[in-house]
């Protein structure tokens, strides 16, 4: 079970040019997205904590994304 609805994931995949997308493909993409966001958030949290903050900022997210 995923936390993200499948329909928006399906639309994102189709927006990249795919004409048809299987439900399995959308579910797999959803799992990858959730894992990526969790990893990115963990890295952003480390950056905020290192800076002495409890709040993650947009800059933390952007910096963490550059490290990936």
Segments predicted by a language model, with ranges:
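Terminal helix-to-tail segments of small alpha-helical proteins
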Residues: 1-68
């Amino acid at each position: 079970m995923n936390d993200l609805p499948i329909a928006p994931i399906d639309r994102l995949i189709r927006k990249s040019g795919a004409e048809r997308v299987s439900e399995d493909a959308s579910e797999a993409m959803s799992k990858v997205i959730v894992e990526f966001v969790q990893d990115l958030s963990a890295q952003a949290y480390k950056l905020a904590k290192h800076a002495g903050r409890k709040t993650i900022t947009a800059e933390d997210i952007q910096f963490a994304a550059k490290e990936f």
